[in-house]
């Protein structure tokens, strides 16, 4: 009677193993890059710039068309896109089906939390956070000048710009604290995926423009990463590169003085500022990168 029992246990164990193998998680969605063209259209592409496609409708009159789209953000899993429509509606797009719905009225510059469950955004009341479906809207930092929010890697805090200062607040509400305050205009704060480094744009170069800088979280020397006009830094999900917007001439030369620029493009660099290279084609203007998926 012993052998059949052992045989039964062996068969049952094999079925459990086989079942686990069949239930392995699906492969991750490839990394998705989003940006807007500064003229009311939002695009997505692969992280190397290939596979470019327009996600939002083509806008006629940029000054009055309610479909004007800007400030897009890709969800962490790369399946959804949030963006601002008409300067006041937050829209959510399924990147596979193309289905679009309005999840909030009265906000702009949406950004996803690291787990994809919440969206932080700017509004007349300050920085707010809501569930991805638009429910449970909460103001976490008051003041009508707060904008450009980004979550910390663990989702517990949001960092943003208030009048040229970089400020951080608990994502569940609480006392805000100033992270960087000096005589310069500092904006576009964003954390590295491991939370060790903060990147931001600032006019501290004194060249009638803005450059990208990095500083260790907790303090330390501020390190310049670009010496030409650049804004909107964002780390790739694996932390290996920083994507950003840079200003150029019509011929594609990066400029120092913003008054000499004719267009914008996306570029990428290694986090120490080296290996700077154009990412988007010269046939289109591009700004405000966001990255999701790929992990």
Residues covered by each model-derived region:
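Sec-dependent bacterial lipoprotein signal peptides
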Residues: 1-18
């Amino acid at each position: 009677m012993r052998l059949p029992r052992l045989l039964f246990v062996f068969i049952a164990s094999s079925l459990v193993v086989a079942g686990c193998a069949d239930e392995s998680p699906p492969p991750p969605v490839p990394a998705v890059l989003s940006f807007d063209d500064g003229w009311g259209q939002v695009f997505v592409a692969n992280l190397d710039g290939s596979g470019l496609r327009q996600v939002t409708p083509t806008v006629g009159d940029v000054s009055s068309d309610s479909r004007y789209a800007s400030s897009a953000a890709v969800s962490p899993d790369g399946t959804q896109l949030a963006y601002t429509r008409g300067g006041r509606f937050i829209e959510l797009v399924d990147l596979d089906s193309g289905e679009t719905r309005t999840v909030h009225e009265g906000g702009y510059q949406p950004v996803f939390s690291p787990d994809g469950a919440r969206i932080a955004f700017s509004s007349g009341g300050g920085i707010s956070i809501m569930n991805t479906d638009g429910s449970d809207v909460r103001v976490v930092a008051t003041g009508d000048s707060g904008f450009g929010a980004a979550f910390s890697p663990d989702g517990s805090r949001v960092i943003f710009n208030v009048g040229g200062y970089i400020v951080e607040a608990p994502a569940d509400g609480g006392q805000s604290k100033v992270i960087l305050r000096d005589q310069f205009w500092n904006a576009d704060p964003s954390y590295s995926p491991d939370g060790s480094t903060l990147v931001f744009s600032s006019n501290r170069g004194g060249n009638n423009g803005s450059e990208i800088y990095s500083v260790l979280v907790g303090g330390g020397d501020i390190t310049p990463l670009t010496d030409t006009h650049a804004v909107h830094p964002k780390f790739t999900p694996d932390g290996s590169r920083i994507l950003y917007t840079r200003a150029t001439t019509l011929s594609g030369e990066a400029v120092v003085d913003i008054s000499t620029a004719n267009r914008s493009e996306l570029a990428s660099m290694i986090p120490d500022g080296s290996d700077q290279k154009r990412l988007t084609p010269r046939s289109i203007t591009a700004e405000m990168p966001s990255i999701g998926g790929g992990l």
